């Protein structure tokens, strides 16, 4: 076993990047792939998404600063094959030091080296923007997924994001590959959103077919602190979307690497 390490990145906030990483991790795990969701965001976005106080979990910070073994800070969820490495406990005044440490040292690559043979998939949720933590994640990843909200500012930021990927490929990580561009929060009832979505598809190669829609269901899941497929009730298009995206990513990984029965209704569940 050697994990596919995928960074989820976006040049701006509010693109649904963390929601995508979380729900994709669930989709991969439900397909039988042992998956680690690794929260690199100094804001601890994964913890907030799961409705937990960000001081409740030990995580990556405790491992790199206090030498707590990884097996003691990785959370095994109630879903088979899904594990979470949270950001850990960090005061706001320590964010800059955390960012510099990841950017200027090998702590992230050393951590991933310890994990790569234990999982099929390692998903890195990075902070919004193209700063030091995102760059450090790309330095150590095999693949990147770029989240693009279907709105004008995200569209204008694509060139900056692709330029960063190219720079990392040339200077630090020649093995890094762009897995694809993922349109997010596409509003089918909004002509401007639909127009931007079509512009993304027509203007760039590698756009995933399984875009994520703007939906109140994601707000409901966020309020309850669960992935969207854990809400219960009939299996909705939003729930199916991430399974489709996971299959699409698997196919692209197979193409790039040469590697690697659906239920209709669920009861509401908890992940942690």
Functional labels for PLM-detected ranges:
Residues 1-272:
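P-loop NTP-binding core
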